[in-house]
Amino acid sequence: NQIDEKFLFAAEHIIDHAETVLMKKLNEHVLIALTDHIAFAAENIRNGIVIRNKLLREIEALYHEEFSIAQWAVDYLNHTLAIPYTYDEAGYIAIHIHSGHSGQTSNHRSIREVTIVSEIIQLIEKELRIDIHSEQMALNYSRLANHLRLLIQRYHNQQYAVLDEEIIEIVKRKYSGSYAVAKKIRVLLTKQYQMSITSEELGYLVIHIERLRG
């Protein structure tokens, strides 16, 4: 089942553009993965199958530069291949680009990162009864999403946030409602993803959650 050359050429052009913008070389695995992806997406479009990207907002917040390149890529694909790719595809393409310049040989880690952030945000929305994705919360949403991304990266790199013990105790007492939500996040991370987070990380989470109550 050979892939049409037009998809290969398109993927090469997108990678060239990404490397120019990011001023970084992308991993060689990206070419095959991206070619496969845009060919598969084209087949879905031909068959009338619409796949919505439920992680689009998180991908845009976490990988902003890659997402901007991916939006350019969708316009380029629509124009060059005359196939109506949707902006949902920008999310998937951004993941490929991010994985390609962050030393990963597959998308697994990037997708896991975005999924964890999305699940935590859903939990916070449910507990606080708010819509974090609303326009008036855009700045706090972006801060929270990036804080969560760094938390996950610190865990993987075995690095630890530093926060004075006294401050942790004050935060727990003063923001007891947000602390209760942060503890639920810790349970989610432990049960679903086998990630244990420190009391310092928990303290920072409480501060971010409290900011959302604003």
Predicted features, each with a name:
Residues 1-214:
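A cross-family "folded-core" feature that marks the main globular domain of proteins
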